[in-house]
């Protein structure tokens, strides 16, 4: 097909040349001047195309860097604003929070009372043991002398454990309910976001908001927030009782605790810097290995294997050096903190023993004080790590709220107010002085007007970035226009319901997309109520039935977009079958045969002919040989239509279209 169209194009050019020669109106010098002018314009088009591609690549790289910087930021912009937002989102579970807070208070009370009461238990036991020793009698534990005290001690611990279990259960319930609420809101939000949002954000970035960020936030609420509140309550209660027991010992404990926190902060800050350096070397090694894999042919062709290996070897050596340093610092935090803790215990034991000998402290109080050391020091050590975890979770919550606060599409008219198409759709499309820009201060389309009559084939051509896809996006109302209007059979599309409007269109995209499911489900994607007979009929019309029957389970074979068993051409045939089954009034074909072999292209061509028969069709194509039979060709440049007409009319005009056409056959 391509060769025939090329020959046709060359023949058209030759016919035009013969016409000029017959008229004798143009001297040879004028012909040479025109040829030179066409060559200059052609070269300018190539250079402009290259500049547009470079500019797009630079903009994409800059946007990726901005997104990466944002993802690495684990500190919320406004902590309290995010906390208030989370509180308002969990409005239906406030009573659960109140019970959690009350449980934490009671847990802290009983958790503090247990070691304090143990002092009485030990003192009573020690007193009875001393009496028995003085009277030279056997000491037996009874309910009257110590049993009641031990039972009360056991019940205090039981109460503390019960309140801890209650708060853990309720906090998990609140976190999961909030997670479910926000996940559902994100799913609904994505359906209301304009196409501009998806153009400006990577798929992984959006998916991360609905998965990683929500999971991190939920996990931190269940563990981090609960641990923070419990730790604060435990530390406050323990230190308060420690001051009651002994002010000097408590001051010694607080001194060593402050020293421990200081060491942890200093080492953690230094570890953060070294870890960042390690991540840089990991990125370098990843890039070097990826280049060595993807550019293997070039490396071998230029005998650069040794240099490529040397780069990886050097980066690996630096990574090993930095990793050893980082691992040492990370592993040194725990022993350093434990050493300071043991030193504190030794000092407290020496001071406490002297007070015990002097009669300023009982044995029970002395052992209870050591219990409080553990009760207070462990939460204090965890507080810094818990705080960092919560900061990261709040940053995740902030990113989730940023997504939920994104501007939405303009709402559709109410069902009773929406404009309706008058009966059967004929497919007459008109752009009337349309103005549009992706940014308010940067208009792209200034005054675009054309009319597509029912059943016509409309081709849209132009260099990269000329506005071809933008025109189709406006037609489908993926974007809202800034001025003018677009009509379908005389009805303003901006006043129509988007669902009803898009139901009239069928799209065959350059990147044919298959969803996870069977082949039959993929063909019936837009028409789930279709019968198997209708699905098979659409597949036959799309020239894909024979291929489907060679699959293991035929139409019940499961496929996905990354399935390697289906070629690009076969994917496009399946999407053509999908469109045929929907039976739309208007077609949009986006370079549907740009990357297939000749045989598949012929099959797609026959399927396209069946698809376009009797329908208004918009074809976006870079290979102009495929649209020489179009009823109307729109030549776009920088968002505007600079030429329109048939193939012969535009060739005769010797303008931008002629330059594009001749450049493909020169």
Where are these regions (language model features)?
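ABC-type nucleotide-binding domain
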Residues: 2-22, 139, 413-666
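Extended non-transmembrane interhelical loops and adjacent amphipathic helices
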Residues: 3-5, 9-13, 22-84, 172-215, ...
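Juxtamembrane helix-loop junctions of ABC transporter transmembrane domains
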Residues: 72, 76, 102-103, 110-126, ...
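An intracellular "coupling" helix at the cytosolic face of ABC transporter transmembrane type-1 domains
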Residues: 88-92, 195-196, 212-221, 225, ...
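Transmembrane helices of ABC transporter permease
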Residues: 92, 96-109, 223-277, 348-361, ...
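Transmembrane helix-loop-helix hairpins at lipid-water interfaces of multipass membrane proteins
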Residues: 97-163, 243-248, 346, 359-363
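Hydrophobic alpha-helical transmembrane bundles that constitute the permease/transmembrane domains
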Residues: 105-113, 157-165, 217-220, 224-236, ...
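Helix-loop-helix
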Residues: 241-255, 325-398, 403-404
């Amino acid at each position: 097909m391509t060769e025939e169209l090329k020959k046709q194009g060359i023949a058209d050019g030759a016919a035009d040349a013969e016409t000029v020669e017959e008229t004798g109106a143009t001297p040879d010098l004028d012909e040479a001047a025109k040829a030179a002018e066409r060559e200059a314009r052609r070269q300018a088009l190539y250079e402009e195309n290259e500049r547009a591609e470079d500019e797009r690549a630079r903009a994409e790289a800059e946007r990726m860097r901005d997104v990466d910087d944002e993802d690495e930021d684990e500190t919320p912009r406004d902590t309290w604003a995010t906390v208030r937002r989370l509180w308002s989102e969990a409005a239906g579970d406030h009573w659960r929070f109140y019970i959690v807070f009350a449980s934490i208070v009671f847990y802290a009370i009983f958790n503090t009372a247990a070691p304090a009461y143990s002092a009485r238990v030990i003192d009573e036991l020690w007193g009875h043991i001393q009496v028995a020793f003085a009277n030279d009698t056997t000491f037996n534990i009874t309910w009257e002398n110590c049993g009641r005290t031990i039972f009360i001690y056991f019940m205090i611990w039981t109460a503390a454990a019960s309140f801890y279990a209650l708060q853990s259960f309720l906090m998990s319930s609140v976190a999961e309910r909030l997670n479910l609420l926000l996940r559902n809101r994100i799913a609904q939000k994505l359906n209301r976001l304009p196409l501009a949002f998806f153009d400006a954000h990577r798929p992984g970035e959006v998916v991360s908001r609905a998965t990683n960020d929500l999971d991190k936030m939920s996990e931190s609420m269940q563990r981090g927030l609960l641990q923070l509140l419990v730790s604060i309550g435990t530390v406050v209660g323990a230190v308060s009782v420690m001051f009651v027991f002994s002010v000097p010992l408590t001051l010694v404990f607080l001194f060593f605790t402050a020293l421990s926190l200081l060491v942890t902060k200093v080492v953690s800050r230094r570890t953060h810097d070294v870890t960042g350096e390690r991540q840089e070397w990991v990125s370098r090694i990843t890039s070097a290995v990826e280049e060595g894999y993807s550019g293997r042919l070039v490396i071998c062709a230029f005998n650069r294997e040794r240099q490529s290996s040397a780069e990886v070897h050097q980066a690996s050596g630096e990574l090993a050096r930095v990793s050893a340093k980082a691992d040492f610092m990370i592993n040194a935090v725990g022993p350093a903190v434990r050493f300071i803790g043991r030193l504190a215990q030794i000092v407290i034991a020496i001071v406490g023993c002297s007070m015990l000998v002097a009669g300023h402290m009982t044995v029970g109080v002395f052992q209870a004080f050591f219990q409080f050391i553990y009760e207070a020091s462990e939460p204090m050590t965890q507080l810094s790590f818990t705080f960092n975890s919560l900061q990261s979770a709040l940053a995740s919550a902030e990113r989730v709220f940023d997504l939920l606060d994104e501007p939405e599409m303009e709402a559709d008219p109410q069902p009773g107010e929406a404009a309706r198409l008058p009966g059967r759709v004929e497919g007459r499309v008109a752009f009337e002085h349309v103005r549009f820009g992706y940014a308010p201060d940067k208009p792209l389309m200034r005054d675009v007007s054309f009319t597509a009559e029912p059943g016509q084939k409309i081709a849209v051509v132009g260099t990269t970035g000329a506005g071809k896809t933008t025109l189709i996006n406006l037609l489908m109302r993926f974007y809202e226009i800034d001025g003018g209007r677009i009509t379908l059979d005389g009805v303003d599309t901006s006043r129509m319901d988007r669902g009803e409007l898009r139901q009239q269109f069928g799209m065959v995209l350059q990147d044919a997309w298959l969803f996870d499911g069977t082949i039959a489900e993929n063909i019936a994607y837009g028409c789930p109520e279709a019968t198997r007979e209708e699905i098979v009929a659409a597949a036959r019309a799309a020239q894909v039935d024979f291929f489907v029957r060679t699959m293991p389970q035929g139409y019940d074979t499961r496929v996905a977009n990354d399935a390697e068993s289906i070629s690009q051409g076969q994917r496009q045939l399946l999407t053509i079958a999908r469109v045929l089954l929907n039976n739309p009034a208007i077609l949009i074909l986006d370079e549907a045969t740009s990357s297939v072999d000749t045989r598949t292209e012929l099959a797609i061509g026959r399927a396209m002919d069946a698809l376009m028969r009797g329908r208004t069709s918009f074809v976006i194509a870079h290979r102009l040989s495929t649209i020489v039979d179009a009823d109307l060709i729109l030549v776009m440049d920088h968002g505007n239509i600079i030429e329109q007409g048939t193939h012969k009319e535009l060739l005769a005009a010797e303008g931008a279209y002629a330059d594009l056409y001749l450049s493909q056959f020169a």
